[in-house]
Amino acid sequence: MVWFKRAKPSIFTKDKRDMPEGLWWKCESCGAMLHKKQVEDHFYTCCECGYHFRLSPYQYFSLLFDEKKYDEFDDNLRAADPLHFSDTRKYPDRVHDILEKTGKTEACRNAIGRVSGHDLVISAMDFGFIGGSMGSVVGEKISRAVSKSIEHNAPLLIISQSGGARMMEGAFSLMQMAKTSARLSQLSARGIPYISLMTNPTMGGTSASYAMLGDINISEPKALIGFAGPRVIRDTIKRDLPEGFQRAEFLLEHGFLDCIVHRRDLKHRLSQILGHLSS
């Protein structure tokens, strides 16, 4: 028995609209929900707490180079598999899948352009490719970036964003620490400035080699910078670590960094540095 009857037909609704993927971003620090446009307008930082989201090399190039114009070079280098490494998966299969999903070919990109009228070579790491790990291709690209700086007598900026050496390449990866350090010494011998920008994270063999060798070492706020991770150190020494240990602010206080620069001020600060160095 029906007690109630609908006096009017049901309200007509259009087909459900799917929200575009990536329209809202969640801050990993404070948990705030941020609209994509809002994040972009704040240079990919959280407008609530200042957290810096990770950028790709191309995003850094667009942020820093005048009129977003630059020339990428040595983008044809690909990782080899000299050790025939395999853990849960074969190394070449892992690289192939990343290429298929993201289009990324390596953990480093090189470009040359102008920043406020000053020539600058930038070598930028990409955390989206195996955690920005340093393998033989990364070492070679940094080496070629040094060569480009020498060729054009232009300062070099390396943007570090890496978990360290790439375990799949074993000793070949560790060799890049010495290789990049030796090549950077050639810049110093010629009086060509090298600026190191450390972002979150800059760890392992990266921090133990080229990342800490800058004539000027700068960092984004609250970046994790160190060799072994805080948890590993804590478990090894069986002691609690100082508050903020291995964060950029702690390193600045203890003399490891020259300055910490918010991303919105990064190009302006680089322009100042390049202006002082060129004069």
Curated annotation (Swiss-Prot):
GO CC field: acetyl-CoA carboxylase complex
Family: Belongs to the AccD/PCCB family.
Native organism: Prosthecochloris aestuarii (strain DSM 271 / SK 413)
Name the UniProt record assigns to this protein: Acetyl-coenzyme A carboxylase carboxyl transferase subunit beta
Described purpose of this protein according to its UniProt entry: Component of the acetyl coenzyme A carboxylase (ACC) complex. Biotin carboxylase (BC) catalyzes the carboxylation of biotin on its carrier protein (BCCP) and then the CO(2) group is transferred by the transcarboxylase to acetyl-CoA to form malonyl-CoA.
Broad enzyme group: transferase
Cofactor: record remark: Binds 1 zinc ion per subunit.
Main localization category: cytoplasm
Gene Ontology biological-process annotations: fatty acid biosynthetic process; malonyl-CoA biosynthetic process
Gene name tied to this protein: accD
Alphabetized UniProt keyword annotations: ATP-binding, Cytoplasm, Fatty acid biosynthesis, Fatty acid metabolism, Lipid biosynthesis, Lipid metabolism, Metal-binding, Nucleotide-binding, Transferase, Zinc, Zinc-finger
Compartments in which it is found: Cytoplasm
Pathway(s) this gene product operates in, as recorded in its UniProt entry: Lipid metabolism; malonyl-CoA biosynthesis; malonyl-CoA from acetyl-CoA: step 1/1
Gene Ontology MF: a single term: zinc ion binding
Residue sites binding Zn(2+) per the record: C27, C30, C46, C49
Gene3D superfamilies: 2-enoyl-CoA Hydratase, Chain A, domain 1
Keyword Cell membrane: no
Subunit architecture: Acetyl-CoA carboxylase is a heterohexamer composed of biotin carboxyl carrier protein (AccB), biotin carboxylase (AccC) and two subunits each of ACCase subunit alpha (AccA) and ACCase subunit beta (AccD).
EC number, UniProt record: 2.1.3.15
Start and end residues, zinc fingers (C4-type): 27-49
InterPro entries in UniProt: AcCoA_carboxyl_beta, Acetyl_CoA_COase_Trfase_b_su, ClpP/crotonase-like_dom_sf, COA_CT_N, Znf-ACC
